[in-house]
């Protein structure tokens, strides 16, 4: 594993490369730096978009605006969960249905049921054995665990946030529909994916397939959110 030191990356020379796109018949220039035999392309574009995302998330946190993280990759589950919990935001995974984004009233009833069952099994369980059959208690418990597993990251959500961070989604349909519903979308995206780019409000240019790249970007975003939250203390 290569340790990336930002000071070293800043101080090494800048190179300008070129490539010919035969399909589109055009000549493309690109900027890159070479560090430990690794090439970093379009470094200024990456920093430009990352700094904009930092500022936006700082302002969100400063004014106590909630953020919802949507994740479609199992390998990023712990990253998303940690980032949401450390910054008092919400998260959910794509392998569960996310229809609630378009039908909040119906989904809110599920959150009410989740809170009710949690209180039931947290505070009143010892009293329930005197009044409810054992089989019914077990059935209710399985319902509770199932809802908690799916929506535990949304348990304390009072209203649906307008700012949504999407991680590892390649569905243009999702981006387009969220955009039509006036959600503000933040996402790590490949700069060459023009269909997705046009539906993202705050773009973070990067490799959204690499766990290490996502983790590096998340550390910066975590700093931005914590930085903004300090304003109110």
Curated annotation (Swiss-Prot):
Family matches, as SUPFAM superfamilies: Ribosomal protein S2
Domain of life: Eukaryota
Keywords tagged on the record: Apicoplast, Plastid, Ribonucleoprotein, Ribosomal protein
Xref: Gene3D superfamilies: Glucose-6-phosphate isomerase like protein, domain 1 (3.40.50.10490), Helix hairpin bin (1.10.287.610)
Entry's Gene Ontology cellular component terms: apicoplast; small ribosomal subunit
Presence of keyword Plastid: yes
Keyword Ribonucleoprotein: yes
A Pfam family that the UniProt record links to this protein: Ribosomal_S2
BP GO annotations: translation
One term of GO molecular function: structural constituent of ribosome
Protein localization: Plastid, Apicoplast
Family annotation (InterPro entries): Ribosomal_uS2, Ribosomal_uS2_bac/mit/plastid, Ribosomal_uS2_flav_dom_sf
Disulfides per UniProt: none
Membership in a protein family: Belongs to the universal ribosomal protein uS2 family.
HAMAP family named in the record: Ribosomal_uS2_B
Protein name: Small ribosomal subunit protein uS2c
Lineage: Eukaryota, Sar, Alveolata, Apicomplexa, Conoidasida
């Amino acid at each position: 594993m290569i340790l990336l030191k930002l000071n070293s990356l800043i101080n090494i020379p800048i190179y300008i490369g070129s490539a010919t796109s035969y399909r589109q018949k055009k000549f493309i220039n690109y900027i890159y730096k070479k560090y430990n035999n690794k090439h970093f392309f379009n470094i200024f574009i990456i920093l430009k978009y990352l700094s904009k995302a930092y500022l936006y998330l700082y302002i969100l946190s400063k004014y106590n605006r909630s953020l919802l993280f949507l994740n479609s990759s199992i390998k990023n589950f712990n990253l998303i969960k940690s980032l949401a919990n450390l910054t008092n935001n919400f998260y959910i995974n794509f392998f569960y249905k996310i229809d609630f984004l378009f039908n909040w009233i119906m989904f809110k009833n599920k959150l009410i049921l989740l809170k009710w069952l949690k209180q039931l099994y947290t505070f009143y369980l010892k009293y329930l054995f005197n009044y409810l059959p054992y089989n019914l208690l077990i059935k209710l418990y399985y319902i509770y665990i199932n809802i908690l597993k799916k929506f535990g990251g949304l348990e304390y959500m009072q209203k649906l946030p307008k700012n949504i961070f999407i991680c590892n989604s390649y569905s243009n349909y999702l981006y387009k529909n969220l955009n039509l519903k006036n959600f503000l979308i933040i996402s790590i995206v490949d700069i060459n994916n023009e269909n997705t780019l046009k539906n993202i409000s705050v773009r973070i240019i990067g490799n959204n397939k690499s766990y290490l790249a996502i983790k590096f970007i998340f550390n910066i975003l975590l700093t931005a959110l914590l930085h903004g939250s300090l304003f109110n203390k």
